[in-house]
Amino acid sequence: MDKLNAISIFCKVIETQSFTLAAKQQNISVAMASKLVSQLEEHLKTRLLQRTTRKIMPTEAGMMYYQRCQGILLDLDEADSSITQLTSSLQGNLLISVPRDFGLLFIAPNLPTFMAKHPHLHIEVEFNDKKIDLLSEGYDLALRIGYMEDSSLVSRKIGTTTVHFAASPNYLETNGIPQTPDDLEHHNGLLYKNAMNQVNWVGSRINQTQRFKIQSKVVSNSGFALLNMAKAGLGIANLPKFILGRAFEKGELIEILPEYKQQKLEIHVVYPNRRHLPIKVTGISLNF
């Protein structure tokens, strides 16, 4: 039995209340339509339709099965449509929010190529670290870094990053290299302050978790600003690897306490949990 075809013809019979009309819509014979529904009933070991000479009605089990299968068939049609339209040009207006530093590094440089492929799409991009309510504020899509709290959003993981302590060679030469977390209390901290106002540093060594204390010399919501301050020798920064990576490679910054690994941060693309999302949203989400 072709189960998907059997389910499809069964749903059509419910909707048209006719094997003849259902068979015509599916481009099969009436005999084949009847056979598929009978095979489905045999497979489920229950009667789905009450057949009389005048009309066809679903049984209680049949109506329950129809309601569940109808949703599945709609999802399949939507999946087919999204892939088909993904290969063509997207269109419409799109409002998205991305973390400031991540967006400037990875989203902004790739927008020209993406927009050239989809010239009928108009995108408004907000580069900020504010935690937004996608539905109430009218956003179509957002990128988020860190723990996902809002279960009402659909999310898709697109990567991970790690966080590291770092300072310039000049700063460490002048102030000494911290050997233990307790040593951090005697250093200048360049602290990142996100929308949740979390400026505490937490790391783990083996199976031990420890909270690091440090005096805040500068607090900022810009990772790039803190990066430049750290390179200038102002203090010790604690930033994601995607911001620090090039400075590490060039020797402009040195990692501190590398044995204290901080929790990995997951990067997600998120969008509202709406059943029939516009193709422009699903299309662009698959491009991340």
Swiss-Prot record:
Q: Can you list the disulfide-bonded cysteine pairs? A: none
Lineage summary: Bacteria, Pseudomonadati, Pseudomonadota, Gammaproteobacteria, Pasteurellales
Entry keywords, A to Z? DNA-binding, Transcription, Transcription regulation
Instruction: Tell me which Gene Ontology terms the entry assigns under biological process.
Output: DNA-templated transcription
Which ranges does the entry annotate as DNA-binding region?
Answer: 19-38
Give the highest taxon in the source lineage: Bacteria
Output the InterPro entries linked to this UniProt entry.
LysR_subst-bd, Tscrpt_reg_HTH_LysR, WH-like_DNA-bd_sf, WH_DNA-bd_sf
Q: Which PANTHER family match?
A: HTH-TYPE TRANSCRIPTIONAL ACTIVATOR TTDR-RELATED, HTH-TYPE TRANSCRIPTIONAL REGULATOR
Q: Which GO MF terms are attached to this record?
A: DNA-binding transcription factor activity; sequence-specific DNA binding
What's the name of the protein? Uncharacterized HTH-type transcriptional regulator HI_1364
Q: Which residues form the HTH lysR-type domain?
A: 1-59
The family line of this record is:
Belongs to the LysR transcriptional regulatory family.
User: Which Pfam families does this UniProt record tie to the protein?
Assistant: HTH_1 (PF00126), LysR_substrate (PF03466)
